[in-house]
Structure formats: structure tokens, C-alpha cells
């Protein structure tokens, strides 16, 4: 999964797996977010953690790292944030450190460990935010969406504040609905969003799921999302419960990787 220079943006690189871009980073411009879903993650951060005072230090855990675009943005947006990244690909991490070094005192620590092992080693009530953005090639590993792992994520959350998950799927979203069912059993509030074309079944694409102990400012999120070049449509409440329907959460006994891509352009971490 090499780092490939972006010829249209000097100094920036893509992390590429096959024909899929896994990450895009300009180390000199951590505020510059190219991938649509990463922009939406930034909006979830703004509207989901709005109640945290500026003087309060936030702790964030990332399951999956790639080029560290989201950790870099958080460090830029909220300096002093403590961030731990669980990234099992030590070779990729070394290449990122060499070609896209983190700024001094970024607060970002990368551990060469998979998500389940990394989370199991962490103390309870540690994190204000968990970002699950991990792919094995073009698939989300099934072990990261099973109920047993979601229990571990719930254990980490201070006040069960927020978990943001990036996955890929297509209509009728059978796999994502099962994942959403597991999140809904453990967190009071849940949002699911994607681009209208994905909702309508026109193509395969990224979906974001945001589970939280306190309600996200959904009105503000929808307003700011609508201003983006590729806005997301967000569902919650009764509409979301109807969408989940009778889907049963995954467990370790029947876990499945996410569905394979169907040729659409996908953005990962």
C-alpha cells in the first residue's frame, strides 16, 4: 500500500491499495480535507462534541490509521487533544512517518496493533471519541462490527460520548443494517448518513454511523452538510429504526466482512 504523490497538489500524497485511494494527506495543510466522507467526519466532530469546553482535553482513539488524515485534522482543529491510533500495518506507518511526518507535539501516538487487541488493552472510560475507520484492503473486517467488540467500545467511552464509523455498502444495506442494530443496542442515539445516490441504490459507497450517549446537534449537522459539494443525507429516530427493521447484530459466531466493492469510487481513511 504505497504512498503516491498527488501530481495535482505538490507536497500531498495518497495511500493507494490497488485502484482504491485509502487516504489523502497534505502534511502542510491538515485543515484541507479532500475525501467527502472525511469532511462529514469533521462535521460530526464539530456538532457531536460541541458541549466539550475549549479548556477540556479530549481523548480520541482511532481504529485504523492509513495516512492519519483525520488525526491530523483533529490535532489542527483542537490542539492538545490526546490521540491513540491502532494501525496494524507497521510498514505503512513507517512510510507515513518518513514521508509525511507528524508535527512536533501533535499528541498523536500510533500503536502497531489491530483494533481489537488495542482496545482490549485500554482502560475503561478513557475516550471521548472513537473513530472506526479500518479496512483490510477494501473490506471492513467482520471482527470490528461484532457485538463483542462493540461492548469493548462502549466500555471505553466517557459517558458513552461518541463513536464514528466509516463503512462501505450498497442498497439494500443488509450488512450495514446489522451493524447499526448492534450500535443501537449500546448507545442512546444513532445517526446514519451517506450521499443521496448511495441511499437511492445508484452505486456502492461510504456510509457513516455515529453512535453517542448524548444527542448530536442534528439540525446544525444537516445544515453544514448541505453546504458541502457532496452533501450527506442523515437519518435518525423513527426513520432509522424503520430502516434497521428486524436486522440482528453481528456476533463473533456469525461475523462477516463488509460487502466487496462494485466498481465505484471509494474513499477510505
In which residue ranges do the predicted regions lie?
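A short, structured beta-strand/loop element
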Residues: 9-25
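A short, flexible beta-alpha/helix-coil linker loop
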Residues: 20-24, 135-138, 170
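Residues that form or immediately flank small-molecule/cofactor binding pockets and catalytic motifs
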Residues: 20, 90, 115, 195-197
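A generic structural signal for alpha->beta connector loops
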Residues: 80-82, 105-107, 160, 187-189, ...
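The AdoMet/dcAdoMet-binding core of the Class I SAM-like
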Residues: 9, 13, 32-155, 173, ...
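C-terminal substrate-binding/active-site "lid" region of AdoMet-derived donor-dependent transferases
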Residues: 147-220
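SAM/dcSAM-binding transferase cores
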Residues: 1-6, 22-30, 199-269
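Generic beta-structure capping elements
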Residues: 18-20, 132, 214
Amino acid at each position: 500500500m504505497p504512498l503516491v504523490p498527488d501530481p495535482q497538489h505538490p507536497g500531498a500524497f495518497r495511500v493507494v491499495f490497488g485502484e482504491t485511494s485509502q487516504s489523502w494527506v497534505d502534511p502542510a495543510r491538515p485543515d484541507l480535507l479532500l475525501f467527502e466522507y472525511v469532511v462529514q467526519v469533521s462535521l460530526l466532530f464539530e456538532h457531536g462534541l460541541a458541549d466539550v469546553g475549549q479548556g477540556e482535553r479530549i481523548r480520541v482513539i482511532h481504529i485504523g490509521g492509513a495516512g492519519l488524515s483525520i488525526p491530523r485534522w483533529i490535532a489542527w482543529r483542537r490542539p492538545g487533544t490526546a490521540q491513540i491510533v491502532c494501525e496494524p500495518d507497521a510498514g505503512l506507518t513507517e512510510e507515513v512517518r518518513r514521508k509525511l511526518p507528524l508535527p512536533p507535539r501533535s499528541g498523536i501516538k500510533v500503536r502497531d496493533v489491530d483494533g481489537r487487541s488495542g482496545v482490549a488493552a485500554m482502560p475503561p472510560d478513557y475516550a471521548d471519541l472513537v473513530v472506526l475507520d479500518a479496512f483490510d484492503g477494501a473490506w471492513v473486517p467482520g471482527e470490528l462490527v461484532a457485538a463483542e467488540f462493540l461492548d469493548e467500545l462502549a466500555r471505553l467511552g466517557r459517558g458513552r460520548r461518541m463513536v464514528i464509523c466509516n463503512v462501505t455498502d450498497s442498497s439494500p444495506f443488509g450488512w450495514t443494517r446489522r451493524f447499526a442494530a448492534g450500535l443501537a443496542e449500546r448507545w442512546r442515539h444513532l445517526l446514519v448518513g451517506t450521499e443521496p445516490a448511495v441511499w437511492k441504490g445508484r452505486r456502492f459507497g461510504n456510509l457513516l454511523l455515529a453512535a453517542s450517549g448524548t444527542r448530536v446537534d442534528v439540525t446544525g449537522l444537516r445544515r453544514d452538510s448541505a453546504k458541502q459539494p457532496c452533501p450527506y443525507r442523515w437519518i435518525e429516530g423513527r426513520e432509522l429504526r424503520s430502516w434497521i427493521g428486524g436486522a440482528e447484530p453481528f456476533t463473533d459466531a456469525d461475523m462477516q466482512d463488509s460487502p466487496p466493492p462494485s466498481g465505484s469510487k471509494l474513499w477510505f481513511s
